[in-house]
């Protein structure tokens, strides 16, 4: 989500047919306004709820998943993450929340976790997490 900068950057680097952004409605309006200033080759979809998508090539989540409540995490995992071939995530919540997610993901994905930074109190660490569908 954010302001739409990742969508614009990916559009400059590669072709895509569809790009789906999950975010709150006010953020979606900002993204639409920002992206309207550029020629985006693929179709951009904005979702405020984790609607089910199938056959996702790549999912990128920079902090968003770890900032959702448990109910939304469940919906997002079951409707979006599990239907992705590859997932790249930055997780920034405490160890318990991260471990719950990783244990869940291990049944569906090959999981790689790399600790990047040791500076984020009270969470302690910042992690890059890569998932590849089994």
PLM feature spans:
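Conserved SAM-binding loop of SAM-dependent methyltransferases across substrates and taxa
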Residues: 3-15
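Conserved S-adenosyl-L-methionine
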Residues: 12-19, 84
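Conserved SAM/SAH-binding beta-strand->alpha-helix loop
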Residues: 24-27
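S-adenosyl-L-methionine
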Residues: 32-54
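A short SAM/SAH-binding and catalytic strip from SAM-dependent methyltransferases
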Residues: 57-71
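A short, conserved alpha-helix within the catalytic core of class I
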Residues: 68-80
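Conserved beta-strand signature within the Rossmann-like core of class I S-adenosyl-L-methionine
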Residues: 84-95
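Core SAM-dependent methyltransferase catalytic element
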Residues: 114-134
């Amino acid at each position: 989500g954010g302001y739409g900068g990742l969508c614009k950057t990916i559009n400059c680097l590669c072709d895509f047919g569809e790009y789906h952004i999950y975010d709150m409605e006010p953020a979606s309006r900002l993204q639409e306004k920002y992206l309207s200033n550029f020629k985006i080759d693929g179709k951009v979809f904005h979702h405020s709820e984790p609607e089910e998508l199938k056959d996702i090539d790549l999912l990128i989540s920079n902090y968003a998943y770890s900032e959702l409540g448990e109910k939304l995490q469940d919906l997002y995992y079951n409707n979006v993450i599990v239907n992705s071939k590859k997932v790249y995530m930055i997780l920034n919540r405490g160890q318990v929340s991260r471990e719950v997610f990783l244990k869940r993901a291990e049944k569906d994905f090959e999981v790689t976790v790399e600790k990047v930074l040791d500076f984020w109190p009270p969470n302690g660490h910042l992690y890059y997490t890569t998932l590849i569908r089994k």
